Amino acid sequence: NVNLNTFDKKIASDIALDIREAGRAKRDNQGKIIRDNDGKIIKVPGTLKHCKAVGWYIEEYKQAQVSINLTNYKKNSIHKTFEEVRKQARKRGVRVTGSEIVGLLPLDALVSSGKYYLKKQKRTTGLPESDLISIAISSLGLNDISIFDHNKKIIEILINTEKTSFSDMKLKSFINNISRETPTPGGGSVSALSAALGAALTSMVANLTYSKKGYESNRNMHIKRSEICQELLNEAMIMIDEDSRSYDEVINAFRLPKKNSEEIKIRQESIYTAT
């Protein structure tokens, strides 16, 4: 929902008609609706694909809103839609004050918006996901009428909230865990951490070089490299936990009983799956 600095629902509805894929009824010079030979209303398509929209007034906020449903955010992004509403609002003498997201959304939807606004600022996009999310939240004005808690709005974060993660530990706690008389976290997790740190350092170098004078012609290369490093960093962070999880599964599989042919078969299948 995109918020406008007006009480007028008609303005919000007019914007909705102009942007939604279904568009609005075509009219003649006298304002009469034009129909085809079968009597069906001829429509003028809206400016955005994969977009349904309506305008309304929210008494609670004392603001008009353009309420939007994006049916394919990968083909029509949140930021593209937000910017189009801003453009249409300016034509009508009003301005967008911010927006809100009702329900949940995929992580990629916010990350791609963060990258879009960083590119507009001519800044590097090879940054941690948390930074990209923060940029998206501020650029889309998601805190305009209520606090936007991305930990409660992003699907992937909600799915992983209940999982215990070594990668979320403080460094000192993680090191102490390694030193204990338990097999996990072990060498694989430490190696994954080393890989993550290496990727982070390489990303830092690429990002520092991006903004350095004299390297302007190579900016695209540095952005690409820093983004690749961020992907590798994220993969390595996942592997910190995956190595320990895999080890535990293998050990549990080897501990299964093997007193008869059926148990032996189940045990072998479990070992195969775990490895």
Sequence positions of predicted segments:
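Amphipathic alpha-helical interface segments
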Residues: 1, 243-275
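Short alpha-helical scaffolding segments that buttress acidic/His motifs in well-ordered protein cores
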Residues: 174-178, 243
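Disorder-to-helix initiation segments
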Residues: 167, 171, 179, 183-190, ...
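A structural-propensity feature for long, helix-poor, extended segments
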Residues: 211-258
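Long, contiguous binding/interaction regions
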Residues: 1-169, 180, 258, 273
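Conserved phosphate/anionic-ligand binding catalytic regions in large, soluble enzymes, centered on
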Residues: 1-2, 178-205
